[in-house]
């Protein structure tokens, strides 16, 4: 495929040439017709169930919507019936990319809109269809100013490890021009300066089944697991910390073992998530192995065992650009697709709604938050583009001085 490319500097000037030079008034709400379209788009997205691995229907609907609104759409297959959606205007290679995810966590909760309180809820209403809809409306309202130098990417699989974004990152047909990438997640309408890293792992204890009346004839996997978790509880106090991100946390998300109260447990498992505030995954991995060393040795001496299985390589803290005037800033403890997209680019993280209600049975936000997100995304796009132009101009001036 032949891709249309333009020199980086000319892209910056061409984009800025169409941006109004006088300050733009910041209304508190969108105009009625745009707000109505936003509400419709958000409702359709939330109404369409898209729990991870089941994103086909929402992807098909969103593709039709974007094509109807004059976007060129490409679908990248991630796995059977699961597609990332890349949308752009007159050119495929753009400087600016807006991206979020269209999958949600289970279970599905239906859409609702309380017109008395103007609260809108349902699964994905915040995380992250609350970002997807405003991104699209914001891009449609500003792409003319930017001479179509903006594109959209909506990925699958963010909630279970980011297979969609990783697939896009390694896609041979991935556009190579993106220099400003804005990610959408619930951030309370603040710019995020970074988030914690992640290291997930599982423990598996193996014992020997026996009648509970004669426990000495067996080896309790549950006992092994309890001892292992006890050592990890002690380790929590010694995990890395930082001023910016606080303490590294370790959550015992799921623990199970045995088959009945009157049977010595033959197996036990635990799934654990560690949110890194400092250090590296290798450092914390070493701490975990060290903390469990004696438990593993003792279990083997009894005829049992304790194994650690790592969910992935993990990643350290993720620093994110937040140098745009006019936005409040924060750091967050949850993970995103930001580290899953490789490349040398400015990356921003913003979205309406709060992570505190995401993944819950009361996931919701106010309609005014959706409207304001459109205005904020537009402002973020323009400010980031202006900053890029200034940096390019400064670089050009420095090069001329050196000559």
What is each stretch, according to the model?
Residues 18-36, 74-77, 202-403:
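Metal-dependent amide/peptide-bond hydrolase catalytic core
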Residues 133-200:
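Acidic/histidine-rich catalytic neighborhood of metal-dependent amide-processing enzymes
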Residues 2-3, 13-125, 144-146, 349:
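Acidic/His- and Gly-rich active-site-bordering loop/insert found
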Residues 99-100, 153-155, 181-185, 204-206, ...:
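Short beta-strand segments
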Residues 120-133, 219-222, 367, 371:
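Short, conserved micro-motifs enriched in small and acidic residues
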Residues 102-116, 178, 193-204:
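Acidic-glycine-rich active-site phosphate/pyrophosphate-binding loop
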Residues 49, 66, 87, 98-101, ...:
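Buried hydrophobic positions in well-ordered alpha/beta secondary-structure cores of metabolic enzymes
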Residues 56-60, 132, 285-289:
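Short, surface-exposed alpha-helical segments at coil->helix boundaries
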């Amino acid at each position: 495929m032949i891709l249309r490319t333009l020199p980086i500097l000319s892209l910056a000037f061409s984009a800025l040439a169409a941006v109004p030079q006088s300050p733009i008034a910041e209304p508190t709400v969108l105009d009625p017709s745009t707000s109505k379209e936003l509400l419709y788009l958000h409702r359709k997205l939330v109404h369409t169930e898209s729990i991870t691995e089941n994103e086909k229907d929402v992807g098909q609907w969103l593709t039709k919507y974007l094509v109807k609104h004059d976007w060129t759409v490409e679908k990248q297959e991630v796995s059977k019936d699961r597609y990332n959606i890349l949308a752009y205007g007159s050119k495929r290679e753009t400087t600016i990319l807006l991206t979020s995810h269209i999958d949600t966590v289970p279970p599905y909760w239906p859409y609702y809109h309380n017109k008395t309180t103007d609260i809108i809820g349902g699964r994905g209403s915040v995380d992250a269809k609350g970002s997807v809809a405003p991104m699209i409306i914001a891009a449609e309202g500003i792409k003319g100013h930017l001479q179509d130098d903006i594109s959209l990417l909506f990925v699958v699989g963010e909630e279970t490890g980011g297979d969609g974004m990783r697939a896009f990152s390694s896609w041979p047909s991935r556009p190579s021009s993106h220099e400003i990438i804005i990610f959408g997640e619930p951030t309370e309408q603040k710019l995020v300066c970074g988030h914690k890293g992640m290291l997930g792992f599982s423990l598996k204890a193996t014992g020997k089944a026996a009648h509970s009346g004669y426990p000495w004839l067996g080896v309790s996997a549950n006992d092994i697991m309890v001892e292992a978790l006890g050592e990890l509880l002690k380790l929590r106090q010694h995990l890395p910390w930082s001023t910016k991100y606080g303490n590294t946390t370790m959550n015992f998300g799921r623990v199970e073992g045995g088959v009945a109260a009157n049977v010595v447990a033959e197996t036990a498992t635990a799934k654990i998530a560690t949110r890194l505030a400092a250090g590296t995954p290798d450092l914390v991995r070493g701490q975990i192995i060290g903390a469990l060393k004696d438990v593993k040795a003792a279990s083997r001496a009894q005829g049992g065992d304790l194994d650690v299985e790592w969910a992935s390589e993990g990643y350290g803290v993720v620093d994110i650009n937040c140098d745009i005037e006019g936005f409040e800033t924060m750091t967050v403890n949850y993970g995103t697709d930001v580290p899953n997209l490789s490349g040398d680019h400015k990356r921003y993280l913003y979205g309406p709604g709060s992570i505190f209600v995401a993944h819950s049975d009361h996931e919701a936000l106010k309609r005014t938050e959706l409207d304001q997100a459109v205005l904020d995304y537009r402002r973020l796009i323009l400010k980031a583009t202006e900053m890029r132009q200034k940096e390019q101009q400064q670089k050009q001036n420095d090069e001329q001085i050196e000559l």
